Swiss-Prot record:
It catalyses: (2R,3S)-3-isopropylmalate = (2S)-2-isopropylmalate. Its EC number is 4.2.1.33. Pathway: Amino-acid biosynthesis; L-leucine biosynthesis; L-leucine from 3-methyl-2-oxobutanoate: step 2/4. Keywords: 4Fe-4S, Amino-acid biosynthesis, Branched-chain amino acid biosynthesis, Iron, Iron-sulfur, Leucine biosynthesis, Lyase, Metal-binding. It comes from Pseudomonas putida (strain ATCC 47054 / DSM 6125 / CFBP 8728 / NCIMB 11950 / KT2440). This is 3-isopropylmalate dehydratase large subunit. Catalyzes the isomerization between 2-isopropylmalate and 3-isopropylmalate, via the formation of 2-isopropylmaleate. Belongs to the aconitase/IPM isomerase family. LeuC type 1 subfamily. SUPFAM superfamilies: Aconitase iron-sulfur domain (SSF53732). InterPro entries: 3-IsopropMal_deHydase_lsu, Acnase/IPM_dHydase_lsu_aba_1/3, Acoase/IPM_deHydtase_lsu_aba, Aconitase_4Fe-4S_BS, Aconitase_4Fe-4S_dom, IPM_dehydratase_rel_enz, IPMI_cat. One of its GO terms (molecular function) is 4 iron, 4 sulfur cluster binding.
Length: 477
């Protein structure tokens, strides 16, 4: 009998019942809640005269709608948009009513759901983790089975702590070799998406492995798993190892004492067996990956910074040619334009992909002693949580950013999506460390270019895209 993949093991450990139609009832260990996808779920509970079945499995925080400017210290009343204010207020009321732990808007622990749960130790290896947000795949970095769910499923989890799901296929993305200086986890995952496309992982749980992945910090692994959804995979995974254990140890929700020892022992099996069989295998050489920049309106429209935007006339596939033509028109680019000739109006460093302390350090390293270009209208840095913000300020990163001309903000989803005051105007180009570059994602008519934090900082000081390796002392240009 063939060995089991990590996904197989996690699935089997949580399978309550296999149903006649081939689906299974899966037990959920951790449920993360935010203000946008939960109001209807809580209302559904009330209408059915139900209560959350396991209160301590839930953790909540507002993130999508919250303002990131200092005015928000005034509380919910500082939220100008009435719908956004109502959603945040409703989350507070629902969590208060049912006794669910919530890090409210001005709690230092508040932040983006996919940042606060790991930093609290609420995401643990071997867990099943769900949230009403597609980037819940982030938590797979811990060797956890994590994915996004819809509002009706949020209600199901609150009421029963279970979900009905069908098992996916297994995909292995193996990245071997050493990353060059200036190349990051964000560049790895963008390169993967560029290689397999946004549908490449459809129907699969995507495990990332290989020496380059093992060398990544937990924050780098979270970045990669975060964007597995952009590669078409609902689930991203990295095997549990010593790096995982070291990150989790001592965090508020992590096991303590003898329970910690037992947990660490049990986590040793959270790896794919050597003889496990994957349905699909993709391989990349880390040493050949360069800093990446998305040029179009899909994450798969991505190139190395030293390349040129494609020419639709050179594409023989008529469907692909049309897609390139539409993307060029929306993005205001011309065929064969050098990536480094793309000028930026705004720069956004933040989001659940890249707003953790290591991301901010990488950006600050580039910003230090430099100034945001006069042609850049705005460059903002938005920490992923209040705790990340406090850590960055202890390290003096805020001063580096402010002296360089960046804005230093309060935590939240911010400019990743146009659901709060941070957004692009039509026609503006933005170097963004977020995860999606769809039309209108950052504001109607806004043009998003996905990059790493270091690349975003480099773009801010240059006013256009530049190979960050040119700014890193001792590395090849």
């Amino acid at each position: 009998m063939a060995g089991k993949t990590l996904y197989d093991k996690l699935w089997e450990a949580h399978e309550v019942k296999r149903r006649d139609d081939g689906s299974s009832l899966i037990y959920i260990d951790r449920h993360i809640i935010h203000e946008v996808t939960s109001p209807q779920a809580f209302e559904g509970l009330r209408l059915a005269n139900r209560k959350p079945w396991r209160i301590d499995a839930n953790i909540a925080t507002p993130d999508h709608n919250v303002p990131t400017t200092p005015e928000r210290k005034g509380g919910i009343e500082a939220i100008v948009d009435q719908v956004s204010r109502l959603q945040v207020q409703t989350l507070d009321e629902n969590c208060d009513e049912y006794g669910i732990v919530e890090f409210k808007m001005n709690d230092e622990r508040q932040g983006i759901v996919h940042v606060i749960s790991p930093e609290q130790g609420a995401t643990l290896p071997g867990m099943t983790v769900v949230c009403g947000d597609s980037h819940t795949s982030t938590h797979g970095a811990f060797g956890a089975l994590a994915h996004g769910i819809g509002t009706s499923e949020v209600e199901h989890v609150l009421a029963t702590q279970c979900l009905v799901a069908k098992k996916m296929k297994n995909m292995l993305v193996r990245v071997e070799g050493q990353l060059p200086a200036g190349v990051t986890a964000k560049d790895i995952v963008l390169a993967v998406i560029g290689k397999i496309g946004t549908a490449g992982g459809n129907g699969h749980a995507m495990e990332f492995a290989g020496s380059a992945i093992r060398e990544l910090s937990m924050e780098g692994r979270m970045t990669i798993c975060n964007m597995s959804i952009e590669a078409g995979a609902r689930v991203g995974l990295v095997a549990t190892d010593a790096t995982t254990v070291a990150y989790v140890e001592g965090r508020p929700y992590a096991p303590k004492g003898e329970q910690w020892k037992q947990a660490v022992e049990s986590w040793k099996d959270l790896v794919s067996d050597d003889d496990a069989v994957f349905d699909t295998v993709v391989e990349l050489d880390a040493s050949q990956i360069k800093p990446q920049v998305s040029w179009g309106t899909s994450p798969e429209m991505v190139l190395a910074v030293d390349q040129r935007v494609p020419d639709p006339a050179a594409e023989t596939d008529l469907v692909k040619r049309g897609s390139i033509e539409r993307a060029l028109k929306y993005m205001g680019l011309t065929a064969n334009q050098a990536i480094t000739d793309i000028k930026l109006d705004r720069v956004f460093i933040g989001s659940c992909t890249n707003s953790r302390i290591e991301d901010l350090r990488a950006a600050a390293e580039i910003a230090k002693g430099r100034k945001v270009a006069a042609s850049v209208k705005q460059a903002i840095v938005v920490p992923g949580s209040g705790l990340v913000k406090a850590q960055a300020e202890r390290e003096g990163l805020d001063k580096i950013f402010l002296e360089a001309g960046f804005e230093w903000r309060e935590p939240g989803c911010s400019m990743c999506l146009a659901m709060n005051p941070d957004r692009l105007e039509s026609g503006e180009h933005c170097a963004s460390t977020s995860n999606r570059n769809f039309e209108g994602r950052q504001g109607a008519g806004g043009r998003t270019h996905l990059v790493s934090p270091a690349m975003a900082a480099a773009a801010a000081v240059a006013g256009h895209f530049i190979d960050v390796r040119e700014l890193i002392q001792g590395s090849a240009a």
